[in-house]
Amino acid sequence: MVTKPTTPKPPPALGIPDSAYTVDVRVIDTGTLLHLNPSLFWQPPIDGFTGLHAPIYCFLVSHGSQHVIFDLGVRTDWENYAPKIVSIIKATTTVTPGSDVPSMLDEDTSGLGIRSADIGAVIWSHNHFDHVGDVSRFPLTTDLIVGPGVRGVSWPGWPSNPDGIVLDSDVEGRVVREVSFEAGLKIGHFDAMDFFGDGSFYLLDAPGHAVGHLCALARTTANEPTFVFMGADACHHPGLLRPSNYLPLPSASTLAGVLTGPPQCPGELLQQLTLPDEPFFTVAPRMFPDHDAATDTVRKIQELDASDNCLVLIAHDLSLRDKIPLFPKTINGWKESQVKTETRWLFCNDFMPALHHLDNKQGIEEELGKQSSLKCS
């Protein structure tokens, strides 16, 4: 069956105040990979899609001489996390270690010259192990910024608290600031905080996955405003964002040009996995305890994702790994270089094992149908 493309619904206005100020954004991929088990993060299951080994994107945000890091990824010696977290890691995932953010800053030979000692603040999107890194690697002049309620559920950490999920060393001697969204600022439908006070960088309240979960929005150009949205773990796969009624699934022939694999008519096979204007997945309750809030957060991101002027980067998007400029390069020129349009549907290649499975299944069913017809004749 060939599905006709759906007419897209016009996306809503971004609702972002004008500003002449921008920040430089550098995406940091430390090389660490984390296995994502689909049943933990998204639903429904797709036969043949058993998960993936995904990166963890962190971000260096520079506002003139001021530098902050949004998320730190996994520490290289993850066995030195709190014992409770080490047990969870061993039971639920596989970590393929790479480097870490402070090492990449301090060992960079590009001439950029931004070192760990220059970082004014580390921002945790939330307090899960694959985002908190090792804050103690930064000097005590580096503040730690967390979302609402995170201090209360995080500290005392281990070893003061035997059941701690973060470490005491993350905050010993360090200023910890908890973000407030009580000022009433809105970016799109998100409650927001203007981090530098000039409209260049916002922290956004994005609940659902964890207490105090934050996303961020950076203004990357001003004359024609463009933005990078840092989605953290608001969702764990682009298939929760797309297709949407703003970005419907393209034609089978267009998809065939995106997909890399041998099944005949892969675009038509892919169209059987979802409706043309509904995402492949929704968030799974197990890792999104506030399921209603998480679903609403994804809906808000879909509105930004539909804008030609906003590039959405979620933390674990494997499809972008070798397609976007990485540290020490900036990603500010993403629109001019057509990063968004050229990568929008690349994540569908994650489903190639599922398409093989579906192709084989339909081939078997077709053959059984032929045999049944022969017996009846």
Curated annotation (Swiss-Prot):
TM annotation in the entry:
none
Q: In which pathway does it act?
A: Secondary metabolite biosynthesis; terpenoid biosynthesis
Q: Which Pfam families match?
A: Lactamase_B (PF00753)
Q: Which UniProt keywords apply?
A: Hydrolase, Metal-binding, Zinc
Which InterPro entries does the protein's record reference? MBL_superfamily_lactonases, Metallo-B-lactamas, RibonucZ/Hydroxyglut_hydro
Q: Does the keyword Phosphoprotein apply?
A: no
Annotated EC: 3.1.1.-
Could you say which residues bind Zn(2+) 1 here? 126, 128, 209, 233
Q: Where does Zn(2+) 2 bind?
A: 130-131, 233
Question: What sort of enzyme, by top EC class, is this?
Answer: hydrolase
Q: Which family does it belong to?
A: Belongs to the metallo-beta-lactamase superfamily.
Briefly state the protein's biological role. Answer: Metallo-hydrolase; part of the gene cluster that mediates the biosynthesis of the phthalide-terpenoid hybrid 11'-O-desmethylfendlerol. Within the pathway, mfma and mfmC act together to convert 3,5-dimethylorsellinic acid (DMOA) into the phthalide 5,7-dihydroxy-4-(hydroxymethyl)-6-methylphthalide. The biosynthesis of 11'-O-desmethylfendlerol begins with the NR-PKS mfmB that forms 3,5-dimethylorsellinic acid (DMOA), which is then transformed into the phthalide 5,7-dihydroxy-4-(hydroxymethyl)-6-methylphthalide by the cytochrome P450 monooxygenase mfmA and the hydrolase mfmC.
Name assigned to this protein: Metallo-hydrolase mfmC
